[in-house]
Amino acid sequence: GLSAIYAAESGANWALASLRQGPVENKERTISLDGREARVRISSVTKEGNTWKGKISSDGVDLQTKAMRFVKITFTVEDGGERKIMVESVASDR
């Protein structure tokens, strides 16, 4: 249901925000709130010069109904003084 969608999208937003503010590296986090959970991974990070590429996957679940939703994003981050995040592709699945 909607709770799983919100959880997955919230996890993806957390990952994008962490790319803007913190180091661009592989990381994993579980976020729980109000009966929803998002398992978020930033993976396959590669760096060439001032550019990083990688993948975000966020698996959202409604802990009561067990409904699940998956969001996958490929991204590029350029850091030439001001960090820019570009989303290359987005996929969402149940």
Where are the language model's segments positioned?
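Conserved functional hotspots that engage anionic ligands or polymers and/or phospholipid headgroups
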Residues: G1-R94
